[in-house]
Amino acid sequence: MSIVKGLIEKMGGNAALLLFVVLLGALVAVITKAGGSAAYGSWAAGKLRSGTSAQLATGFLGCLIFIDDYFNCFTVGTVMRPVTDKNKVSREKLAYLIDATAAPVCIIAPISSWAASVISYYPTDGTMTGMQAFLRAIPMNLYAILSIVMVFWLCIRKKGDFGPMAAAQRRAEEQGLQNL
Protein backbone atom coordinates (compact mmCIF):
# COMPACT_ATOMS: atom_id res chain seq x y z
CA MET A 1 0.00 0.00 0.00
CA SER A 2 2.77 2.49 0.75
CA ILE A 3 4.20 2.14 -2.80
CA VAL A 4 0.81 2.95 -4.31
CA LYS A 5 0.40 5.89 -1.95
CA GLY A 6 3.86 7.20 -2.90
CA LEU A 7 3.09 6.91 -6.62
CA ILE A 8 -0.19 8.76 -6.20
CA GLU A 9 1.55 11.57 -4.30
CA LYS A 10 4.28 11.92 -6.97
CA MET A 11 1.81 11.75 -9.84
CA GLY A 12 -0.41 14.27 -8.09
CA GLY A 13 2.41 16.83 -8.07
CA ASN A 14 3.09 16.33 -11.79
CA ALA A 15 -0.61 16.50 -12.59
CA ALA A 16 -0.85 19.79 -10.70
CA LEU A 17 2.09 21.20 -12.69
CA LEU A 18 0.55 20.03 -15.97
CA LEU A 19 -2.80 21.56 -15.00
CA PHE A 20 -1.02 24.81 -14.10
CA VAL A 21 0.65 25.02 -17.54
CA VAL A 22 -2.61 24.17 -19.35
CA LEU A 23 -4.49 26.84 -17.40
CA LEU A 24 -1.79 29.41 -18.20
CA GLY A 25 -2.12 28.58 -21.89
CA ALA A 26 -5.89 28.93 -21.63
CA LEU A 27 -5.48 32.29 -19.90
CA VAL A 28 -3.26 33.55 -22.73
CA ALA A 29 -5.83 32.32 -25.28
CA VAL A 30 -8.65 34.14 -23.45
CA ILE A 31 -6.62 37.36 -23.22
CA THR A 32 -5.79 37.10 -26.92
CA LYS A 33 -9.39 36.35 -27.98
CA ALA A 34 -10.67 39.21 -25.81
CA GLY A 35 -8.33 41.58 -27.62
CA GLY A 36 -6.05 42.33 -24.68
CA SER A 37 -2.89 41.40 -26.57
CA ALA A 38 -3.95 43.40 -29.62
CA ALA A 39 -4.81 46.42 -27.46
CA TYR A 40 -1.42 46.34 -25.74
CA GLY A 41 0.27 45.78 -29.09
CA SER A 42 -1.53 48.80 -30.58
CA TRP A 43 -0.63 50.95 -27.60
CA ALA A 44 3.00 49.81 -27.66
CA ALA A 45 3.24 50.24 -31.44
CA GLY A 46 2.37 53.92 -31.02
CA LYS A 47 5.02 54.41 -28.32
CA LEU A 48 7.84 52.25 -29.68
CA ARG A 49 9.14 53.75 -32.88
CA SER A 50 12.46 51.98 -33.47
CA GLY A 51 13.83 48.47 -33.61
CA THR A 52 15.97 49.16 -30.56
CA SER A 53 13.01 50.33 -28.46
CA ALA A 54 10.89 47.35 -29.60
CA GLN A 55 13.70 44.95 -28.68
CA LEU A 56 14.24 46.59 -25.29
CA ALA A 57 10.49 46.47 -24.58
CA THR A 58 10.50 42.77 -25.47
CA GLY A 59 13.38 42.18 -23.06
CA PHE A 60 11.74 44.16 -20.26
CA LEU A 61 8.37 42.44 -20.74
CA GLY A 62 10.16 39.09 -20.76
CA CYS A 63 11.73 39.98 -17.40
CA LEU A 64 8.43 41.14 -15.90
CA ILE A 65 6.56 37.91 -16.59
CA PHE A 66 8.34 35.48 -14.30
CA ILE A 67 5.52 33.20 -13.11
CA ASP A 68 6.22 30.49 -15.69
CA ASP A 69 8.51 30.21 -18.70
CA TYR A 70 5.73 28.88 -20.97
CA PHE A 71 3.41 31.67 -19.90
CA ASN A 72 6.26 34.10 -20.60
CA CYS A 73 6.76 32.75 -24.13
CA PHE A 74 3.03 32.70 -24.91
CA THR A 75 2.41 36.20 -23.61
CA VAL A 76 5.52 38.04 -24.77
CA GLY A 77 5.39 36.43 -28.20
CA THR A 78 1.71 37.22 -28.71
CA VAL A 79 2.00 40.79 -27.47
CA MET A 80 5.31 41.84 -29.00
CA ARG A 81 5.12 40.17 -32.43
CA PRO A 82 3.06 42.97 -34.04
CA VAL A 83 5.30 45.62 -32.45
CA THR A 84 8.56 44.02 -33.56
CA ASP A 85 7.13 43.32 -37.03
CA LYS A 86 6.23 47.00 -37.41
CA ASN A 87 9.75 48.00 -36.36
CA LYS A 88 11.43 45.45 -38.66
CA VAL A 89 12.89 43.23 -35.98
CA SER A 90 13.32 39.75 -37.43
CA ARG A 91 11.22 36.92 -36.08
CA GLU A 92 14.46 35.09 -35.32
CA LYS A 93 15.61 37.96 -33.12
CA LEU A 94 12.21 38.09 -31.41
CA ALA A 95 12.40 34.34 -30.73
CA TYR A 96 15.88 34.74 -29.25
CA LEU A 97 14.81 37.64 -27.01
CA ILE A 98 11.82 35.68 -25.74
CA ASP A 99 13.74 32.45 -25.18
CA ALA A 100 16.69 34.19 -23.52
CA THR A 101 14.44 35.85 -20.94
CA ALA A 102 11.77 33.17 -20.31
CA ALA A 103 13.56 30.37 -18.45
CA PRO A 104 16.45 32.48 -17.10
CA VAL A 105 14.08 34.91 -15.39
CA CYS A 106 11.92 32.08 -14.02
CA ILE A 107 14.86 30.19 -12.52
CA ILE A 108 16.05 33.22 -10.52
CA ALA A 109 12.59 34.46 -9.47
CA PRO A 110 11.51 33.08 -6.09
CA ILE A 111 7.84 33.23 -7.11
CA SER A 112 7.70 31.01 -10.19
CA SER A 113 6.81 27.50 -11.26
CA TRP A 114 10.54 26.75 -11.55
CA ALA A 115 11.18 27.88 -7.98
CA ALA A 116 8.34 25.68 -6.74
CA SER A 117 9.78 22.72 -8.60
CA VAL A 118 13.38 23.28 -7.42
CA ILE A 119 12.28 23.85 -3.82
CA SER A 120 10.28 20.60 -3.86
CA TYR A 121 13.43 18.61 -4.74
CA TYR A 122 15.45 19.97 -1.82
CA PRO A 123 15.74 17.40 0.98
CA THR A 124 14.33 18.38 4.34
CA ASP A 125 17.34 17.60 6.50
CA GLY A 126 16.79 20.50 8.88
CA THR A 127 19.83 22.58 7.90
CA MET A 128 17.85 24.98 5.73
CA THR A 129 14.55 25.14 3.93
CA GLY A 130 14.18 24.63 0.21
CA MET A 131 13.42 28.34 -0.20
CA GLN A 132 16.59 29.32 1.67
CA ALA A 133 18.66 27.03 -0.54
CA PHE A 134 16.96 28.40 -3.66
CA LEU A 135 17.64 32.01 -2.64
CA ARG A 136 21.29 31.23 -1.87
CA ALA A 137 21.70 29.60 -5.27
CA ILE A 138 20.46 32.61 -7.27
CA PRO A 139 23.89 34.33 -7.50
CA MET A 140 25.37 31.05 -8.75
CA ASN A 141 22.94 30.86 -11.67
CA LEU A 142 25.48 32.40 -14.02
CA TYR A 143 23.81 31.13 -17.19
CA ALA A 144 20.53 32.80 -16.28
CA ILE A 145 22.16 36.06 -15.20
CA LEU A 146 24.49 36.27 -18.22
CA SER A 147 21.66 35.35 -20.59
CA ILE A 148 19.56 38.27 -19.36
CA VAL A 149 22.55 40.64 -19.53
CA MET A 150 23.27 39.44 -23.09
CA VAL A 151 19.68 40.21 -24.15
CA PHE A 152 19.99 43.86 -23.22
CA TRP A 153 23.55 44.12 -24.54
CA LEU A 154 22.40 42.82 -27.94
CA CYS A 155 19.39 45.17 -27.92
CA ILE A 156 21.52 48.25 -27.26
CA ARG A 157 24.44 47.45 -29.59
CA LYS A 158 23.75 48.56 -33.14
CA LYS A 159 25.99 45.84 -34.61
CA GLY A 160 25.37 43.19 -31.95
CA ASP A 161 23.92 40.55 -34.28
CA PHE A 162 26.23 37.98 -35.84
CA GLY A 163 25.98 34.86 -37.98
CA PRO A 164 22.50 33.75 -39.06
CA MET A 165 20.89 36.29 -36.70
CA ALA A 166 22.64 39.14 -38.55
CA ALA A 167 21.45 37.75 -41.91
CA ALA A 168 17.87 37.43 -40.64
CA GLN A 169 17.92 40.94 -39.21
CA ARG A 170 19.35 42.38 -42.43
CA ARG A 171 16.60 40.59 -44.41
CA ALA A 172 13.90 41.98 -42.09
CA GLU A 173 15.24 45.53 -42.39
CA GLU A 174 15.56 45.38 -46.19
CA GLN A 175 12.43 43.40 -47.11
CA GLY A 176 10.19 43.96 -44.10
CA LEU A 177 7.98 41.32 -42.52
CA GLN A 178 4.78 41.74 -44.55
CA ASN A 179 4.86 38.19 -45.96
CA LEU A 180 4.83 36.44 -42.57
Regions found by a protein language model. Give the residues of each.
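Transmembrane helix-loop junctions in multipass membrane proteins, especially transporters and channels
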Residues: 1, 33, 37, 71, ...
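Membrane-embedded alpha-helical segments and adjacent helix-loop junctions characteristic
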Residues: 1-95
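Interfacial loop/helix-cap signal at membrane boundaries in integral membrane proteins
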Residues: 1-14, 128-137, 178-180
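Alpha-helical scaffold segments in soluble metabolic enzymes
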Residues: 6, 26, 39, 82, ...
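Generic hydrophobic, helix-prone segments enriched in Leu/Val/Ile
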Residues: 7, 122-123, 134-135, 168-174
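Generic secondary-structure transition motif, activating predominantly at the C-termini of alpha-helices
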Residues: 8-11, 48, 102, 139, ...
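Alpha-helical transmembrane segments and, especially, the helix-loop junctions at the ends
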Residues: 62-81, 93-159
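Long, contiguous bundles of hydrophobic transmembrane helices that form the permeation core
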Residues: 147-180
